[in-house]
């Protein structure tokens, strides 16, 4: 059984993935709950899919990804 933190992560990530324009507040909350590199990479995959699927991705979304990528790349 998943821990409450893991369940929280999955639920919030699902909301972000399902919403065409997820709120900055919701993404901030998820980022505050990131506990593992795997979670960070999963979250980045969702954000990158959103950017890829949007003809005009928001600057805020692009900035968010650029801020998180170095964390995923660091050992």
Whereabouts are the PLM-identified features?
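Short, surface-exposed, charged/polar-biased interaction segments
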Residues: 29, 33, 47-51, 64-68, ...
